[in-house]
Every structure is written in structure tokens, then in C-alpha cells.
Regions:
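A short, acidic, amphipathic alpha-helical segment used as a generic capping/interface helix at domain edges
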Residues: 104-106
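Outer-membrane beta-barrel "beta-signal"
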Residues: 113-115, 139-151
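Outer-membrane beta-barrel architecture
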Residues: 21, 77, 120, 140-144
Length: 151
């Protein structure tokens, strides 16, 4: 007996106008946790099958994001993105552990300025939410700043 994972992925980016861009990505599959940001460190690609002792199973999971970018001028832009990652239970795994990760969401807004062709500065705010299988919510906020110089 063996089990097989699979994954589907679609992504896009397109210009709505000269200044507005839309971008996004969608992923769905079984055993694709290493390809999804929130799930990549949870070791859920292949897990025990509680209904079949000594056997393994692959769990269904989903991840997507969508964003919008506005180019203020050729060297300054702002953007916002919403993302969701979701782990589904199969054969009561991992839902039999009420504190196991169920889904995560985040919203991020940022601004970047390409000061020169070699130097970029930016600022970003991120708000993240996590919900476990017991529906217990958690959240966190983060502020990032960047100064990058390429030699």
C-alpha cells in the first residue's frame, strides 16, 4: 500500500492600468506543505493514518494570496496583499489534537522607494491570524524596515 500526493498551482500578474498591477497565486493539493509558507515547518506533508496502524497518509491543504500594487512614480510603489493557508483534517488527523494549526491568514501593506539603481528602502506592516482546530484564534503584528544596497 502506498499513498501519493499531488499539487495544483496557478499564479498571475497583470497590469490593470499603467500604474495598477494585480497579482496572485493559488495552491491546492495533498502532501504539499513544504510549498506553503505557514505549513512548511509543521511536517504535515505525510502523517500517520490513525485508521490504519503503521500506514501514512497525505493531508489536503490550500494556500492562496491576492494583492494589488500601485506605482506612484517609476521608482516608488505601494502594495497590499491578503493571504490564507488552510490545513484540512483527514481520518481525524490532526483535528484530534485541538491545538493543531488549522488555518492562517495575513494582511500586509508596504511601500518601497528605489532611491538609485543600487539602493532601495522600504517599510512594511503585517498583521497575521492563526486559528487552531479548536477554533482558538491568535494574532500578531509586525513592522519591517529595509535598507538595501546592491554592489
Amino acid at each position: 500500500f502506498s499513498t501519493t500526493g499531488f499539487g495544483l498551482q496557478a499564479s498571475t500578474t497583470f497590469n490593470v492600468t499603467k500604474k495598477w498591477q494585480v497579482f496572485g497565486q493559488f495552491n491546492y493539493g495533498k502532501g504539499i506543505g513544504s510549498y506553503l509558507n505557514d505549513l512548511s515547518n509543521l511536517n504535515v506533508d505525510i502523517v500517520p493514518d490513525p485508521d490504519n496502524e503503521g500506514k501514512m497518509q497525505v493531508l489536503p491543504m490550500l494556500g492562496w494570496y491576492a494583492g494589488l500594487q500601485y506605482n506612484i512614480c517609476p521608482n516608488i510603489f505601494v502594495s497590499g496583499t491578503y493571504s490564507l493557508s488552510r490545513l484540512y483534517s483527514e481520518n481525524n488527523y490532526p483535528s484530534d489534537n485541538p491545538e493543531a494549526y488549522r488555518k492562517g491568514q495575513y494582511f500586509v501593506a508596504n511601500a518601497f522607494w528605489n532611491v538609485t539603481s543600487n539602493m532601495q528602502v522600504g517599510v512594511e506592516y503585517l498583521r497575521g491570524w492563526r486559528t487552531d482546530f479548536n477554533f482558538s484564534p491568535r494574532h500578531a503584528n509586525r513592522l519591517n524596515m529595509l535598507v538595501q544596497y546592491s554592489f
